[in-house]
């Protein structure tokens, strides 16, 4: 796991609404999302960081080898980069972003375990 992926502080943590990666708000703005930046373009765009991440999430998992872990398969992060992931993320991506993802062939499934989609 790359050190820059690990949250640098326990305050101002946010989780990506698409992949559930957890970072500080500044890390998302500076580096974007390691898994989703090709689609969400959060890097350098604080407004997109607020739209595409949530400060409300439950549990965290540090994933070192996502391809080898049954937990990563259960959490649907086995194809993502090593990092810290939320178990459940409250919220949904804005409809415009969901439509854009669909037009690019990316299926969006909410990471909020309270909502069944």
Swiss-Prot record:
Post-translational modification summary for this protein: Ubiquitinated by UBR5 when not assembled in the DSIF complex, leading to its degradation: UBR5 recognizes and binds a degron that is not accessible when SUPT4H1 is part of the DSIF complex.
GO biological process, one term: transcription elongation-coupled chromatin remodeling
Binding site for Zn(2+): 16, 19, 33, 36
InterPro entries on file: RPABC4/Spt4, Spt4, Spt4/RpoE2_Znf, Spt4_sf
Location relative to the cell: Nucleus
CDD domains attached to this UniProt entry: Spt4
Gene Ontology CC terms: DSIF complex
Keywords on record: Acetylation, Activator, Metal-binding, Nucleus, Repressor, Transcription, Transcription regulation, Ubl conjugation, Zinc, Zinc-finger
Zinc finger (C4-type): 16-36
Segments of this protein annotated with the region Interaction with SUPT5H: 2-40
Pfam families: Spt4
Residues with N-acetylalanine modification: 2
SUPFAM superfamilies: RNA polymerase subunits
GO molecular function per UniProt: RNA polymerase II complex binding; zinc ion binding
The family this protein is said to belong to: Belongs to the SPT4 family.
Quaternary assembly: Interacts with SUPT5H to form DSIF. DSIF interacts with the positive transcription elongation factor b complex (P-TEFb complex), which is composed of CDK9 and cyclin-T (CCNT1 or CCNT2). DSIF interacts with RNA polymerase II, and this interaction is reduced by phosphorylation of the C-terminal domain (CTD) of POLR2A by P-TEFb. DSIF also interacts with the NELF complex, which is composed of NELFA, NELFB, NELFD and NELFE, and this interaction occurs following prior binding of DSIF to RNA polymerase II.
PANTHER family: SUPPRESSOR OF TY 4, TRANSCRIPTION ELONGATION FACTOR SPT4
Biological role: Component of the DRB sensitivity-inducing factor complex (DSIF complex), which regulates mRNA processing and transcription elongation by RNA polymerase II. DSIF positively regulates mRNA capping by stimulating the mRNA guanylyltransferase activity of RNGTT/CAP1A. DSIF also acts cooperatively with the negative elongation factor complex (NELF complex) to enhance transcriptional pausing at sites proximal to the promoter. Transcriptional pausing may facilitate the assembly of an elongation competent RNA polymerase II complex.
Protein name per the record: Transcription elongation factor SPT4
UniProt organism field: Pongo abelii
């Amino acid at each position: 796991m790359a050190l820059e992926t690990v949250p640098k502080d326990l305050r101002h943590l946010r989780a990506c609404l698409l992949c559930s990666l957890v970072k500080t708000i500044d890390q998302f703005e500076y580096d974007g999302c390691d898994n989703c930046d090709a689609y969400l373009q959060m890097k350098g765009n604080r407004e997109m960081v607020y739209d595409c991440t949530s400060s409300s999430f439950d549990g965290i998992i540090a994933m070192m080898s996502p391809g080898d872990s049954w937990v990563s398969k259960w959490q649907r992060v086995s194809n993502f980069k090593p990092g810290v992931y939320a178990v459940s993320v409250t919220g949904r991506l804005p409809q415009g972003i969901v439509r854009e993802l669909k037009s690019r062939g990316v299926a969006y499934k909410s990471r909020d375990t309270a909502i069944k989609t």
